[in-house]
């Protein structure tokens, strides 16, 4: 699984764009990405510009995948009118292959979408489940 291919399986975002990629250094790949989320009518859409670091192996273990992300500003994607700039306070995902065909996934997300807590609570229950279902479908498709 590679983050630049996220748009093939992650339906959370309506747009996923790699703004900048840096050469891999000490086993860490760094990218700057732009994410756009379309919201229901009567609500402004949201976007995020974030820096993501990706380890395809962790502590010498080749059966691990780790990402850590946080919001940043980038001159190529300044805030837009009628789009609220959400803040990715911190996000992380750790995947570990326990055995062939069995993987553990740990996720931490602290995102400020700058909306009322009622709506956040509603989507907070649904989003991680949808994310994992989409990831699982994609992994099964790729393993065939």
Place the predicted regions along the sequence by residue:
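Eukaryotic helix-grip
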Residues: 1-144
């Amino acid at each position: 699984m590679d983050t630049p291919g996220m748009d093939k399986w992650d339906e959370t975002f309506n747009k996923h764009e790699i703004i900048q990629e840096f050469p891999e250094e000490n086993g860490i790949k760094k990218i700057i990405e732009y994410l756009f989320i379309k919201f229901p009518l009567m609500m402004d859409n949201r976007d995020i510009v974030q820096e993501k670091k990706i380890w395809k192996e962790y502590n010498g273990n080749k059966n691990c995948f780790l990402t850590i992300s946080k919001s940043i500003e980038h001159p190529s994607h300044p805030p837009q009118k009628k789009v609220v700039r959400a803040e990715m306070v911190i996000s992380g995902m750790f995947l570990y292959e326990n055995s062939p065909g069995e993987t553990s996934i740990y996720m931490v997300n602290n995102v400020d979408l700058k909306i009322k807590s009622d709506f956040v609570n509603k989507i907070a229950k649904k989003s991680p489940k949808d994310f994992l279902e989409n990831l699982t479908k994609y992994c099964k498709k790729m393993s065939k």
